[in-house]
Amino acid sequence: GFIRFEIEIHGLDPRIPTETFNEISRGFNDANGGYLSNGLEDKNRYYMRHVYQGLVRCIDFLTSLPEWDGKNVAVQGGSQGGALAIIAAGLDKRVTQCVANHPALSDMAAYAEKGRTGGYPHFTKYHEILKNKDCLNTMAYYDVVNFARKVTVPTYLTWGYNDITCPPTTSYAVWNTLKCEKEALLTPINEHWTTNETNYQQMVWIKEHLIK
């Protein structure tokens, strides 16, 4: 069996009432870009800084459990979760397998160059951000591509050609940067979702790559 640990990046108690959760969520996702633009002017104050650091703390917790086999730490996610899976694999050498679906936060600053499409969260909707050099520097600093360079473990990446949330060009930016053992599953018809078959194949892949 597996130990499964699913994270919620905002530190919210999953037991709070749905109405309260929805109210807080609206606050995190306001009309000015929401939490993904919070602190973007300063890379040391950017909201996602504590999220990225939290990935390492999650692995600290998992590897402290007596049920852990002492060998394997697989990270998996889609969209923002796909981004965090790659980031975790790049930050922490305890990670042994990485699976990511259509990772967000990839090639974010591409919109600043004429004719290029950037990744989610699509800061092109907030033109002032793209005019701010400090914001662009922070985007580049936290971009998934930077962490993909540091990944050394087997990685399984999937994306679809009809995805307009995380465009396929941004997944290719990640794929082309990965220098580790890697495998891709391209699903041309897919938008921003995965099929049950894809999810199953990912679990098979993880099982095949477990350290015995």
Residue ranges and their predicted role:
Residues 3-53, 110, 116-117:
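Cap/lid segment of the alpha/beta-hydrolase catalytic domain
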Residues 34-79:
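Gly/Ser-rich "nucleophile elbow"/oxyanion-hole loop immediately N-terminal to the catalytic nucleophile
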Residues 82, 86-131, 186, 194-197:
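Hydrolase active-site cap/lid region
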Residues 131-147:
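Active-site nucleophile elbow and catalytic-triad environment of alpha/beta-hydrolase enzymes
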Residues 150-151, 157-159:
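Short beta-strand/loop motif that positions the catalytic acidic residue
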Residues 153, 167-176:
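Short alpha-helix in the alpha/beta-hydrolase fold that links the catalytic acid
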Residues 161-166, 192-193:
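Acidic catalytic loop of the alpha/beta-hydrolase fold
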Residues 172-212:
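C-terminal catalytic histidine-bearing segment of alpha/beta-hydrolase fold enzymes
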